[in-house]
């Protein structure tokens, strides 16, 4: 693989530190996980083999708890929504509650301080708790029951009423409408609050401002939002208009509170059926959103993948995605009507190999799908980000649906950055997503970032749970997930460091470090393996990948001018002859070192693969090397003879193989699990996958290095395309070059789409674990050759490599939460 590391910045970096990260590794202290406390005091936890065990919970116990959550979705009760359902009367009798079990639950679930809601021990009072408490008080007063509960609830509200006035406090969706609406109901029933009238007037003033303000969306989005919070509008709401948002399950936006308010104000029989079914299933309390199984389980799967621990739950994840797939093909509203849920489902299903088209995403092809929705009214960055990410999972170059979604969502996200109206934490997420598209992210690097930003239960006490109209804890077992992720990341770093030491020894043993021209970068090349094939059990695949990365880069330097024509031809003949190399001999010590490094390493890899492959596959490795050096020799001859290929196609006939992905993937594929038959290596599918990966790498390399290569007398695709479209020299050279870059980007995008389609499709001769290696390679190449902001610098790559292999996790926890790890 040809890395863009021949640039001046890397040369300076190598001269400053010839051993690269190996030197730092030898000086590195034992691994520790750095913990930042709430007061900013940094502590360190020395971790043994099992961090989870040292913190009081065995690894298998962590897995069992997470596995249980995956299998059984546990709905978080919403005191707010339960209170609204409790206010629904029996039809024909306004003096009798239709759902007495909801009243009973409210009376049994008041907290000692008089409040209701998701106020975990130690959490601060927030607007959600205040809203839930007021709703429960009003519900009890509606049926003239629970006088003591009402008294204690009113006392709590009086003590904390200031929270409702604090505009800096995070609020549930529509709080200024829902809270004031309940306050209006409460005063109408004769309830008296131990607060000043001016404070109550202040709440109604905030309500007036909310009703009059222009939000981020359109008139359509405002109507949808007002229907969503309709329980807070009372007589101001057009209840017939609300029914336009009724779903097939007869709810209003899957919201029990909005549906209950609709029944109360209009006695809608179909909406009542939704509530009857809901209360019957859950035996009393209701959640803030129902149904939410699909959303909750998708979030769990997505979280486990982002934290790097999904491999522990492959069976459960497969079952969940099978269920999601069934919902998708049946176009179920639970999945399809929510922008974020639909986009997440599309991304996960497609990346897991389910055969789905982008037709289900067609509803979001116009920006109006966002602007005219509740998401637009609330400026919902999370849903927009999910939509943007899903648009990048393109398997067809001419997929106009995903192309249009990606175009407008990227533009809106960029506008959010420019306007600076997005919360700081969300802003960082937007900037990161725009800088690193899905096809240019490396899993282990992403996972470390996610682990360090993951919120524990302790943090949620301070920062609050995800808020809809009321607090929503979801199905995430926060502390268990974090503990398992920290443990596995730490364990993998220990493995990575040992493998890096072994690779350093291999470099010395092969005598590659005696070659003055060799760019020996075991740390950087190993990073590309560890960041994609991160599970500890893929050790041999990582080592084979890295060894061949180092070898191909060294051989490329040799053919780029450090070897004479005689030496280059000699090396090509030796590799073609392979076991019969003794008949040819070596033209120089340099050639001898190179050949034996390739030959002996390939034989060792093949021998290690015998138990998995049930045969010796060294011939396939040797053949991949033959294709590679043959292409390199052709390019070298062009350079020495000052020959310019007449077409891009002629150039690519050699340049694709010379990019040298072949030896890397062929060697690593032997260790990823499945047995690879002769049929696999000879199949059109395998050859096409290899050609696409090499093409992607070659085009990325050409687009970044064409200016330097022109000065060196080398040709590449950008220059050739510009020459062929310059009108015989009559056109502008600059314009021709820009047109060439645009065309090559189009070809690159098409190749990337084709590769993803082959990698994710169901069936095929090449086993899925092997196919994934080609996608990993593509992601590495896009990351390495990233043009934006000059990211690919020596310092940038060094920092990324250190983050995965060396640097301890920076996990932010409150001191009282340390024991949960």
Curated annotation (Swiss-Prot):
Record's keyword terms, sorted: Lyase, Magnesium, Metal-binding, Plant defense
Cofactor binding description: Binds 3 Mg(2+) ions per subunit.
Transmembrane regions listed in the UniProt entry: none
Phenotypic consequence of residue 718 to V: No effect on the catalytic activity
A Pfam cross-reference name: Terpene_synth_C
Protein EC: 4.2.3.103
Effect of residue 664 to T: Changes catalytic activity. Converts ent-copalyl diphosphate to ent-pimara-8(14),15-diene and diphosphate
Broad enzyme group: lyase
Required co-factors: Mg(2+)
Highest taxon listed in the record's lineage: Eukaryota
Chain residues that bind Mg(2+) 1: 556, 560
Tagged with keyword Iron-sulfur: no
Free-text function comment from the UniProt entry: Involved in the biosynthesis of ent-kaurene diterpenoids natural products. Catalyzes the conversion of ent-copalyl diphosphate to the phytoalexin precursor ent-isokaur-15-ene.
Family named by the database record: Belongs to the terpene synthase family.
Free-text comment on this protein's domains from its UniProt entry: The Asp-Asp-Xaa-Xaa-Asp/Glu (DDXXD/E) motif is important for the catalytic activity, presumably through binding to Mg(2+).
Note: Phytoalexins are diterpenoid secondary metabolites involved in the defense mechanism of the plant and produced in response to attack (by a pathogen, elicitor or UV irradiation).
Name of the protein in its database record: Ent-isokaur-15-ene synthase
Lineage, broadest ranks: Eukaryota, Viridiplantae, Streptophyta, Embryophyta, Tracheophyta
